[in-house]
Amino acid sequence: MKREILKHQLVPEHVILNESEAKRVLKELDAHPEQLPKIKTTDPVAKAIGAKRGDIVKIIRKSPTAEEFVTYRLVQD
């Protein structure tokens, strides 16, 4: 049941960044992790992908105008 949520058409793709990817993204955004929007460890998608506190998650949404919209979230309790 965990993985079924990831296949739903309204749930965008979520990817946990590794440490080097997270550092690169934070540098590009000129931001600290705490400045990112948050996602809870209890969020159903965070649970399904195995996100832990402190992880940065890349969310890729389909957009009719931009084709893709990418955002990042910091996982917190």
Swiss-Prot record:
It is an enzyme of class 2 (transferase). It catalyses: RNA(n) + a ribonucleoside 5'-triphosphate = RNA(n+1) + diphosphate. One of its GO terms (molecular function) is DNA binding. Its EC number is 2.7.7.6. It is found in: Cytoplasm. Its main location: cytoplasm. Keywords: Cytoplasm, DNA-directed RNA polymerase, Nucleotidyltransferase, Transcription, Transferase. The keyword Cytoplasm applies. It comes from the Archaea. DNA-dependent RNA polymerase (RNAP) catalyzes the transcription of DNA into RNA using the four ribonucleoside triphosphates as substrates. NCBIfam families: PRK09570.1 (NF007129). This is DNA-directed RNA polymerase subunit Rpo5. The gene is rpo5.
